[in-house]
Amino acid sequence: MRLHFKAMESYGEGNNASQAMVADKVELIQMLFDGLLDSLVTARGHIQRGSIEDKNKSLVRAGRIVIGLQGALDLEKGGDLARNLHELYSYVTRRLVYVNAHNDLAVLEEVQTLMGDIRQAWRDVPNLLPKSTPAPGVPMSAAMH
């Protein structure tokens, strides 16, 4: 994931490119959270149906996403927020292992709630970003992507 961020950072110059880069990062993180939450819902269904192999695949996928989110944190620049998220992601990873071993739907619900709350916070991020006009020669549709 850091490679993707590095690639985006090397794109363009100026305020609009910088804002687009931040928006792209936010969108990527939102997509990761969507995939994580989808995997958790899928795992719940597999647990309820007793489909152990499919449950395992869903929980492993969820765990990989959490580890990816954790690895994308910049602990130096992110300060307390990044450190707190790092600890939360470690906790969630341990809870996913527990769910996988014990088929515990209550613990799965706990993880879904925690990650759903974080996802909602990321949903609100675009509203906090400054609005800008596209750079000269950049079509409005391109500036929005």
Predicted regions and their residues:
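N-terminal intrinsically disordered, cationic/polar leader segments
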Residues: 1-42, 48-49, 54-60, 67, ...
